[in-house]
């Protein structure tokens, strides 16, 4: 009958609508979910965290970056299957502690992000993440210590990007100690000053080298027996155009990490050779 056909058509239409809605939900979830750990991914975290901070600018938050210490060794010793299981266990542990009152995500590799309100309870929960016990091949328990860097956000400033707060949490994470259980570190103003100095050094090092701001000094070497100078040690200082003399203890570690130390070494060699040639020419 016509009524039956109308009913069937309505059912088909409803089924199509339900399917379309389900597909939209599925693809949206797929877009925002990390395929391995099944927790939100960084894209979802960034979008949602900004909304939370914008809508709660009167509250204080903690933005946390964490990863597994020596995760590469876990992969090398036990294989990638165990490595993946470790990441899933970390995600499960984070989810169990913060699913009610926090935002969390897998950022990349073995790195995870957490955003929670700054309360004593949440600080204790973050501290409790430090050590994770996992089972290897269902027999061996293996302790996986986590490195945790936390950036406090007393009042959210929209002028500062969320990426900046994440960078600060990552900097704090680098300060975590390998001794005892000191695997959690909070970002401080002192770290900020060191970060600003590092950024200044890296942004100006090439210009400074080309402009001859690195000055070579010669420290005499004495032979005590004869009380005579037998040589000299070449020392370099950075005579910055605005900041004045910068100690090598400040810029050398930065150069050693980013590889610019090679350029500086060749510059010093060149200055030493020029000095020696000048002395030979002068007789």
Question: Can you say where each PLM-predicted feature lies in the sequence?
Answer:
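Catalytic strand-loop-helix junctions within cyclic-nucleotide turnover domains
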Residues: 115-124, 140-141, 145-165, 172, ...
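Helix C-cap/alpha-to-beta connector motif
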Residues: 267-283
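Active-site core of bacterial EAL-family cyclic-dinucleotide phosphodiesterase domains
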Residues: 197-254
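Signal-transducing coiled-coil linker helices
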Residues: 2-35, 42-53, 193
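Conserved long alpha-helical elements within nucleotide-processing catalytic cores of c-di-GMP signaling
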Residues: 29-33, 38-62, 69-99, 105-113, ...
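GGDEF/GGEEF active-site signature
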Residues: 85, 89-155, 278
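Nucleotide second-messenger and two-component phosphorelay signaling modules
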Residues: 31, 50-62, 66, 77, ...
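Cyclic nucleotide signaling catalytic output domains
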Residues: 104, 147-157, 161-179, 185-200, ...
């Amino acid at each position: 009958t016509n009524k039956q056909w109308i009913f069937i058509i309505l059912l088909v239409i409803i089924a199509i609508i339900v399917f379309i809605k389900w597909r939209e939900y599925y693809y949206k979830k797929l877009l925002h979910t990390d395929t391995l750990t099944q927790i939100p991914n960084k894209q979802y975290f960034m979008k949602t965290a900004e909304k939370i901070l914008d809508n709660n600018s009167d509250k204080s938050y903690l933005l946390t970056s964490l990863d597994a210490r020596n995760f590469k060794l876990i992969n090398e010793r036990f294989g990638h299957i165990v490595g993946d299981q470790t990441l899933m266990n970390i995600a499960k542990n984070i989810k169990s502690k913060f699913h009610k009152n926090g935002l969390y995500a897998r950022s990349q590799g073995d790195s995870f992000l957490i955003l929670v309100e700054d309360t004593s309870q949440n600080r204790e929960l973050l501290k409790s993440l430090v050590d994770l016990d996992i089972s290897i091949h269902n027999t061996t328990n293996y302790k996986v210590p986590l490195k945790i860097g936390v950036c406090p956000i007393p009042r959210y400033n929209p002028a500062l990007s969320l990426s900046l707060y994440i960078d600060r949490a990552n900097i704090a994470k680098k300060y975590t100690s390998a001794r005892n259980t000191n695997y959690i570190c909070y970002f401080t103003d002192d770290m900020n000053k060191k970060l600003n100095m590092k950024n200044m050094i890296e942004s100006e090092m090439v210009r400074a080298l080309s402009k001859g701001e690195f000055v070579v000094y010669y420290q005499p070497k004495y032979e005590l027996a004869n009380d005579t100078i037998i040589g000299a040690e070449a020392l370099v200082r950075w005579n910055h155009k605005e900041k004045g003399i910068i100690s090598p203890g400040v810029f050398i570690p930065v150069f050693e990490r980013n590889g610019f130390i090679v350029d500086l070494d060749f510059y010093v060699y060149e200055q030493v050779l020029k000095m020696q040639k000048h002395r030979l020419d002068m007789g």
